[in-house]
Every structure is written in C-alpha cells, then in structure tokens.
Amino acid sequence: MTSESTLPPVVPPLHSPKSPVWPTFPFHREGSRIWERGGGIAPRDLPSPLPTKRTRTYSATARASAGPVFKGVCKQFSRSQGHGFITPENGSEDIFVHVSDIEGEYVPVEGDEVTYKICPIPPKNQKFQAVEVVLTQLAPHTPHETWSGQVVGS
C-alpha cells in the first residue's frame, strides 16, 4: 500500500473583492505633466488648485463681451480663496470677482483701480459678477504681487 492521502485537496473559500475596485497607478496625470505619487514633491511644484479660466457658455461670454465697461476700485481680494469684491464707481452694491476673470500679471489689492464688464451669476442670474477685469491703476505705496509670486513695489 502507498501512503497517499484519500482526503480531497483543501480549497480556500471564495471572497468577492472589496467594492468598488480601483486600479492603483503609481502616478496621475495633471494637464500635460505627470506627478509621481509619494515622490516627495516640493509644494512649489504642485499644480495650482485655482483654475486659470472659467468655462462659460458662448452666449454668456458673448453677452459679457458686448456689454459696457464699468470702472471701480478693488475693495478686497484673497488670492488664497480665489475671489474678492469690487466697489463700483457709481456707488452701487459691491460686485463679486473670481480669480479666473482677472486679466494681467498682478494680483489685485485694496485700492487698485479697475475696469470690468458684468455677467449674471448662474443659476438664478439675479446677481452679477465682474468679468474681463483689468487693473488700470495700481494702488500707490502698496506692494503688489505677480501671479508667479514675485513682489513688486513698496
């Protein structure tokens, strides 16, 4: 007689995978740059969380571009929050401005003179926001920062 086992082979129980199953990749794509995970990226190399331009429907963009140009003064702007407010020259209610609607190389600061057009804020379109904002006169004796982080003036 041989010493072969007559017991059936041990089969591990079946387990369903945890749901949902996400493939793990060592990197993810951000625009045209590839960022390695866990590679010790310096904070200055990370992509900005702020969008560079907003996507609007053609009709909203066309209406804003065709509208009149208004003048005002920057009341407040927070680069970290990505928005601020403009006080219109005519003294009406302050108007919202988003970082993506600012033209030029400088971050607005309190007292900067600006020109802008207006666009309704969805979904109700009852309030307006400033678009195509251009700094026409920088506030005197105030340091200004460029979008790249360089401080200019004092």
Swiss-Prot record:
Principal location class: nucleus
Region (Disordered), start-end ranges: 38-62
SMART domains (UniProt xref): CSP
Domain CSD: 69-136
GO cellular component terms, A-Z: cytoplasm; nucleus
Localization of this protein: Nucleus; Cytoplasm
Phosphoprotein recorded as keyword: yes
Highest taxon of source: Eukaryota
Cross-referenced SUPFAM superfamilies: Nucleic acid-binding proteins
GO terms under biological process: mRNA processing
Molecular-function annotations in GO: RNA binding
Alphabetical list of PROSITE patterns matching this protein: CSD_1, CSD_2
Modified residues (Phosphoserine): S19
UniProt keyword annotation of GTP-binding present: no
UniProt keywords, alphabetically: Cytoplasm, mRNA processing, Nucleus, Phosphoprotein, RNA-binding
Span of the signal peptide: none
Stated role: RNA-binding factor which binds specifically to the very 3'-UTR ends of both histone H1 and H3.3 mRNAs, encompassing the polyadenylation signal. Might play a central role in the negative regulation of histone variant synthesis in the developing brain.
Protein's name in the database: Cold shock domain-containing protein C2
Lineage: Eukaryota, Metazoa, Chordata, Craniata, Vertebrata
Name of the encoding gene: Csdc2
